[in-house]
Amino acid sequence: MNNDKAGKNLTKEAPRSPKTRVGNYVVLGRTYDKCRALLWGDIGEYHFDCPLDNMLFGFKGVKGDDFKAEVEKGASDTEMAQWLDTHGEKKTPEEVKAWSDEMMAANPYENPEKRDWFVEQVSVYNLDPKTTTLFDWLDVDDKESCAMASA
């Protein structure tokens, strides 16, 4: 375990991109950064255990509180990937890769229940909702939010 119990200041820098894979899991690095910021930094406008985090937790069948408790022990992001591998629903490396690939391609525009919300979100940045993935939008939103915070 890592004894470095410090979190990012998410009012000054964004968590990792949801595209960043840790142990082949997309979203994990971002979820980890937000959890550490909640525990030992400044989470700012971000939220831990949010719908995006819950996509990861739901895929593995774990709870946000259990994830947080493990991070609180000082687990590194690599150790958290190993923890996910051994907790919740057993998933093969192929299943993790397939889920991560599916998440990378996810576009809320394709979901009639989320379409209007997504169109509104991406229009702020003049992005095409039909071709912009959820992760692409989050990356742009993070970059713009951090630029505004440092201005």
Where are these predicted regions, by residue range?
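Generic structural signal for well-ordered, non-membrane alpha-helices
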Residues: D33, V62-D65, E94
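Polar/charged low-complexity regulatory segments
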Residues: N2-I43, M103, N107-A151
